[in-house]
Amino acid sequence: MTLDVPKYENFSKVYDLFNDEMPYNLWLDIIKYYGENVNSILDIGSGTGTVLNALKVPRKVGIDNSLTMVEIARENDPTSEYFCDDMTQFDLSESFDMIIATADVLNYAKDVTAFGNVLQNAYKHLNKDGVFIFDVHTEYKMKTDFNYELYSDSNDDVFYTWQTIPGEAELSVWHELTFFIKVQNDLYEKFEETHYQQTYKHSDILQLANEAGFTIHHSFSDFDIDNPLTEVAERNFYILKRL
């Protein structure tokens, strides 16, 4: 399998249907806690615009590598600007008070070099005293929830299955998605996509953040700012600052 960056071109059509139970309110609580007085924000991997649309910030920009996602976001959220771009090499020619990358976006950085490039890009696009917030899957989650597990979901118009297969690299996973979208009456159209994710050890993330120029302000797990990183957490959060 090649490590092409997944673009969610087909899944974007049903993305919101199967993310309606995602705890976006918890991400928003964290963003608002650390960004009480921000005047500009950049969302890396902004998807269909759910997070930015919920924020009351004067200047809001989102980037995503899926043009279909960007088009949907533009329709959903006229209060923000959205661009199709690569998180490892974007250049927007402006800087922001806050940058966010929610819902394990950084796990789509296919290797440590790509992960470091995202951090360096974020640093370059932050104002002085700016904050970068992101989360990643934990080692525990990669080894348990994504260890040949099969998931499925459906509603009246869509059915999909999601097979997880551990990748060749340590702490990596292939997501094989198959979904059927109703087009009329009993006629369904089948789509298939394969996505690759890689997570990174806490010590490696700290090193890459330091190399990018960041100060590590805080780290915690599972949406609780008072919850230290633990071996059985599912999602780790990082709050980085450009001083």
What positions do the PLM features span?
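Conserved class I S-adenosyl-L-methionine
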Residues: 1-47
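Class I SAM-dependent methyltransferase SAM/SAH-binding core
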Residues: 48-89
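A short glycine-rich, Lys/Arg-flanked "PGG" loop and its adjoining helix->strand segment in the class I
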Residues: 116-128
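C-terminal lobe and adjacent flexible extensions of AdoMet/dcAdoMet transferase-like proteins
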Residues: 202-243
